[in-house]
C-alpha cells in the first residue's frame, strides 16, 4: 500500500533513502514529506527516480510550509497504511495519535538527550577524539549527537583542558570554505535555541570555558562552546 515518509532537515538525502528503499522493496508506493527547511533535495531525488525509469506515481513528494496540515492529510487518509517519521518527540506524539484513528503502522525515530560518559580510567586522547566526533558533527545538529558530557571527578580537569583546546582550534565558517570544521545552524530558531540553553545554564550557575556567544561568521553561526558546572536543573540536561 502507501507509505508516508516524513523526513527531517539535518540529513535530507540519507533519511529519504533509508525510508524509501525498504518501502519500494516491499512493493509499496511512497509519499515523501520533506522538512520545509530542505525541500529541494527531496524534489531532486524524485526527479532522479523518474530519469532512472521509476514509473509515475511510485515515488511522490509533497512540500509546503504548513507541516501540521500536510501531516494531518497523510495520517487521516486511509490509503496510507504506514507512517515513518524522523524528528522531534513532540511531533512524533502527534503523528502517533493521529495514525491511531485508522490503525496505521508507524515507525518513529525521535529526539533524545544522549550522554557521553568519561570515566577516570579512560584513554584521555581517545575520549577527546570521541567527544569531538560525537558533538560537532553537522554543527551538533544530529539526533545521535552527545548532548551532555559526564566526566568522572578524577579526570575532569584534564579532560576539560584537552577538550577545550580542541574546541577552540576549530574553524567556524561556511561549509564551502576550505578547512571549515563547524558550519551554521539551520535557521534563526535553531540559533535562538542554543542561545536560550546557554543563557539558562549560566543563570543557574554554569561557567563558560570557551565560546558562549554568536560568531562573527554570520547570524546563524554560534561559537563552539564548553560549559562546566552544569546540573540537572538546567534545560540542556534534558532538552535536545
Which residues does each predicted region cover?
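ALDH superfamily catalytic-core signature
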Residues: 82, 90-235
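Rossmann-like NAD(P) dinucleotide-binding subdomain of oxidoreductase/dehydrogenase enzymes
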Residues: 1-126
Amino acid at each position: 500500500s502507501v507509505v508516508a515518509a516524513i523526513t527531517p532537515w539535518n540529513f535530507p538525502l540519507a533519511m529519504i533513502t533509508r525510508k524509501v528503499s525498504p518501502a519500494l522493496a516491499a512493493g509499496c508506493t511512497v509519499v515523501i514529506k520533506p522538512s520545509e527547511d530542505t525541500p529541494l533535495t527531496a524534489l531532486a531525488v524524485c526527479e532522479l527516480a523518474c530519469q532512472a525509469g521509476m514509473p509515475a506515481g511510485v515515488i511522490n513528494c509533497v512540500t509546503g510550509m504548513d507541516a501540521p496540515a500536510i501531516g494531518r492529510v497523510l495520517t487521516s487518509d486511509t490509503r496510507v497504511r504506514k507512517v515513518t517519521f524522523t524528528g522531534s518527540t513532540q511531533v512524533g506524539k502527534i503523528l502517533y495519535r493521529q495514525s491511531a484513528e485508522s490503525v496505521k503502522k508507524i515507525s518513529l525515530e525521535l529526539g533524545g538527550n544522549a550522554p557521553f560518559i568519561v570515566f577516570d580510567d579512560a584513554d584521555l586522547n581517545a575520549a577527546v577524539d570521541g567527544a569531538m566526533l560525537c558533538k560537532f558533527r553537522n554543527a551538533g545538529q544530529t539526533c545521535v549527537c552527545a548532548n551532555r558530557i559526564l566526566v568522572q571527578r578524577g579526570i575532569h580537569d584534564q579532560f576539560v583542558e584537552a577538550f577545550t583546546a580542541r574546541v577552540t582550534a576549530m574553524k567556524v565558517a561556511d561549509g564551502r570554505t576550505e578547512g571549515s570544521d563547524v558550519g551554521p545552524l539551520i535557521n534563526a530558531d535553531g540559533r535562538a535555541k542554543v542561545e536560550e540553553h546557554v543563557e539558562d545554564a549560566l543563570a543557574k550557575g554554569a561557567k563558560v570555558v570557551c565560546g558562549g556567544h554568536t560568531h562573527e561568521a554570520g547570524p546563524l553561526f554560534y561559537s563552539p562552546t564548553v560549559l562546566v558546572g552544569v546540573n540537572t536543573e538546567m534545560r540542556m540536561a534534558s532538552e535536545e
